Amino acid sequence: MKNWLIGLVVTMAWTSPCAAQIAPELLGGADPNKPMFSESFYKGIEGNWVLVREPVNTGYHCSVNFITPDSTLSLRGPADAGMARKGHGSLWLISGAIPLVTKPEIAPITLSSTNHPTQNVQAAHVSMPGQSSGALLLTIDVQKSVREKPDSNELAIQLQGKEVFRSKVVQLQLAYRQLSACMSAARK
């Protein structure tokens, strides 16, 4: 299981076309000559939501990214048909407080939120290419994740007993709708 998850993490980290910490304006906006399309769909005091997808929407490589000055939460849909059949997507948590690693590893983390009980789970711990921060990656059932839920959530992540991520995420329903609409192109 660990080798499979590490393989998935390495593949997604190096082949995933969007790095959530990159400023949206650098991802290409609506320019068809850029590798990714990005569109801000919410700007608020707490942070900004940005949709990122391929210039021609295939329904794969869709993500919604909640970006604050300190962190990014990236909810990503399937990268290909195989992941889509299994309902797999990923949750990326990126923060300057997450240490860099020399190679991807599986790490126990404590995830607490206002909407769920505290959980101890395994996450992939990776370094972001070209970034000075690390990231934590959880494989998720993306269809369950975008179902109706509370519209805000405060998340905190501990790694090795130290808090490395905290964010009050707002406008979740809007983000879920944006991600679902983007992923629906794969079903057409």
Question: What does each of the following model-derived ranges do?
Answer:
Residues 10-11:
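Short, linear, compositionally biased motifs with a strong N-terminal bias
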Residues 20-188:
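A generic "folded-domain core" signal
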Residues 14-17:
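N-terminal signal peptide c-region/cleavage motif recognized by signal peptidases
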Residues 1-6:
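Bacterial N-terminal signal peptides that target proteins for export
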